[in-house]
């Protein structure tokens, strides 16, 4: 966080930014470990705790999820599994290819709002 402008941007836009650590959970509830319920922690416990401790706008239209690398995977996984919770999702350097692999993501492969910034930077004139 200290090497980015996230805090300044969040402050200017009156946003709450939460960065949870999900270990090597793949953002999934462990079947045999009741204390390792990562999906529930992020989709149930965390929003409840935020609403309890901060004055926030209610409703999915005010909630998004985002992540970098493995966190990007978790963000898209949870957003697709819980579309009632999130109105937007951001994936930065996430381990996925929305144009070829996942049928649930393929519907956005031709969406003009989806931009592959890595390809754009690599081939800006194409």
Predicted segments, located by residue:
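Non-catalytic cap/lid and distal C-terminal segments of serine-dependent acyl enzymes
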Residues: 1-126
